[in-house]
Design a protein with these regions (language model features):
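Active-site pocket-shaping loop/turn-to-helix segments
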Residues: 11, 60-81, 129-137, 155-167, ...
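Condensing-enzyme catalytic core mediating Claisen C-C bond formation in acyl metabolism
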Residues: 3-7, 27-38, 42-46, 210-282, ...
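Glycine-/small-residue-rich "gating" segment that lines the acyl/pantetheine channel
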Residues: 123-129, 170, 191-241, 259-261, ...
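Active-site-proximal alpha-helical scaffold in enzymes
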Residues: 138-142, 146-149, 154-187, 223-243, ...
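Conserved active-site "lid/cap" helical segment
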Residues: 15, 20-102, 108-109, 274-286
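Conserved small-residue
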Residues: 8, 26, 100, 145, ...
Length: 407
């Protein structure tokens, strides 16, 4: 594939708002999980909640979109000067030539939960001020971002469970390569809600401790929330126009193995297909990857399947899951971890797997227990969702991409 430029990016999660606080937490191996105190949930588990979401209503002209999920999206869009960079892209290309691709799993379902608590006791009708289309509808986050920037290009919501925030890069790439747009705002946003917490509890997948990916004592996930975005554009025709360390999207792999509604293929066949496709599309070999950001949810079956998918290809490649720090942010996870990959490339370090203290010897992985500075030229980021919806992304720096082109 032709590389795409990540001209700007940002991330907001329980470990920090924006890149600086996120980077500090990753370098210091500092997690943001706390005992669950969300809404009226009575669950013995840990969550990754973003501070300040409920204190910032959505912009007045977008009041119809008012809900926690869109508040979180807005909080993410206003970090790191991201909104200004998008505005500059709109001025350069035109509002009809900038697309929007947002991944989400549950969107603003919390607003529906609250609406049902306010039903008319006589007839059961939902309150008149409940706006399903602008809140709970899975398209809501994409529509909100499109309206936030007054864009007129194509807008899509991607909802493929936990790979949603990664698959947005593939959708944007296809639109750009087809010549339909010149740039895209891609990202993922999912906020906490009772449906998610109790749903994963019913599957017996919630851990009673902060989750411990790839650890011998791992026993389940911790749910988090996040908003992460990137501005994706074509690489300029003149190489001199790029900074030597600019971040590029080099490869994308997607697969759908449909093994089971909530369990991965035990041998990780669909995941491996996505990884191999990403390597092929980037014209790279496994030996070119310097760090793997694992999907790493900390359930026994998920981590084992991902380990088998990586197999001998990456047995000696440093890897870690940042979900021990952020929790599993579901539809936002792929986008959030893409930004982690970009930070690893920009800052030349690999982040530690927070909460993991004793890597499972049964899993073939060179698991990073302490963040360290090292040469990082290309990063593989994995996102594997329920139902076998898999996506792997490869990011690199321009210097490495130039070397790849010369081979």
């Amino acid at each position: 594939m032709n590389p795409l430029l990540l001209s700007h990016f940002t991330a907001t999660s329980c470990i920090g708002r924006g890149l600086d606080t996120t980077l500090d937490a990753l370098r210091d191996a500092r997690g943001g999980l706390v005992p669950c105190n969300f809404e009226r949930a009575d669950l013995d588990t840990w969550i990754g909640a973003v501070d300040g979401v409920d204190e910032q209503p959505v912009r007045a002209d977008l009041a119809d979109f008012e809900c926690r999920n869109n508040r979180l999206a807005q909080l993410g869009l206003t970090q790191d000067g991201f909104d200004a960079r998008v505005a500059a892209a709109v001025a350069r290309y035109g509002a009809a030539r900038v697309g929007v691709f947002v991944g989400t799993s549950t969107a603003g379902i919390l607003e529906t939960e609250r609406a049902y608590q306010r039903r008319d006791p006589a007839g059961g009708a939902l309150p008149a001020d409940f706006r399903y289309a602008h809140t709970h509808n899975p398209y809501s986050p994409a529509a909100f971002v499109r309206a936030y920037f007054a864009l007129r290009g194509p807008a899509m919501a991607i909802s493929s469970a936990c790979s949603s925030g990664a698959k947005v890069f593939g959708s944007a790439r296809r639109m750009i390569e087809a010549g339909l747009i010149d740039a895209a705002v891609v990202g993922g946003v999912d906020s906490l809600c009772l449906t998610t917490l109790y749903g994963f509890n019913s599957l017996e997948l919630l851990s009673r401790q902060p989750c411990r990916p790839f650890d011998v004592a791992r026993d389940g996930i911790s749910i988090g929330e996040a908003a992460a975005f990137a501005l994706v554009e074509r690489v300029p025709a003149a190489p001199a126009a790029l900074d030597g360390d600019a971040i590029l999207l080099l490869g994308i792999g997607e697969s759908s193995d449909a093994h089971h509604m909530s369990s991965p293929h035990p041998e990780g066949l669909g995941a491996r297909a996505a990884i191999e496709q990403a390597l092929a599309s980037a014209s790279l070999g496994a030996h070119d990857i310097d760090y793997v950001n694992l999907h790493g949810t900390a359930t026994p079956s998920n981590d084992a399947a991902e380990s088998r998918a990586l197999g001998a290809l990456f047995a000696r490649t440093p890897c870690s899951s940042t979900k021990g720090a952020t929790g599993h942010t579901l539809g936002a996870a792929g986008a959030l971890e893409a930004i982690v990959a970009a930070l690893a490339l920009r800052e030349q370090f690999v982040p530690a797997g927070v909460n993991t203290t004793q890597p499972d010897p049964a899993l073939a992985a060179d698991y990073v227990l302490a963040s360290r500075d090292t040469r990082v030229r290309a990063v593989l980021s994995n996102s594997f969702g329920f139902g076998g919806t898999n996506c792997s992304l490869i990011f690199g720096r321009t210097q490495h991409a130039a070397g790849r082109a010369r081979r």
